[in-house]
Amino acid sequence: MEKKQFVISVYTENHVGLLNRIAIIFSRRKINIENLNTFPSGSEGIHRFIICIRETEEAVQKLVKQIEKQVEVLQASYSI
């Protein structure tokens, strides 16, 4: 499968250490984060992460499922 550019969007509760746990999910799979932005969403106490990577769609699907397993993660999705 061909690697493509993907954008992963993650909505989370604002908790200390969550960014580190999400980054570990990427590093265990040897996936490089090309771009990462985090900012408050429109709801109080909720933050949004925008993560850009270059990977196969199959790997991204598995990655998003793993991110969603984190307790503080409310929603994770990806797009091309």
What are the roles of these predicted feature ranges?
Residues 1-80:
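A conserved regulatory-domain signal marking ACT and ACT-like small-molecule sensing domains
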